[in-house]
Amino acid sequence: NEGGDGMKKAVYVPHYAPAEAKAKDLCKGAQSLLERYEIITKYVSDKIAYDYIRAITIPKRGGLPDVERWWKLHMGICLDIASLTVGMLRAVSIPASLIIGWADGHYHAWVEARIGGKKYLYDHDDPQKKVKLYKKERMY
């Protein structure tokens, strides 16, 4: 046990006030949760780059997200990006989880949101939705 489920959730999806404030500001005037989801994921897709240096220096499994670095540099790896995206979605009342597992055989992290009983997957690294098989290992 890594400090209980609450501790793990706080480590993998920490509250980060600047990102949460940005999410609320972006979503002012949004009429639905789906519209908020689309605004946040578009913002992340448009503003955040993949950090190839961090990708080769972080442990392949067991690394932790660095949301402050992500926010300041506008870049991160899948874990950083998914973690902060979940935090931004939750800040605007969208139920969302950070998923860690496998995507087409590669260790990966992505976002799962639930809106109106429907599941939405967001994967910054796969904007064309080419990944055919996601397999959950952990969820936060």
Feature locations, PLM:
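Short, aromatic- and glycine-rich surface loops/edge beta-strands on solvent-exposed regions
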Residues: 1
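Secondary-structure boundary elements
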Residues: 6-76, 84
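Hydrophobic/aromatic-rich core segments of domains that either
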Residues: 81-140
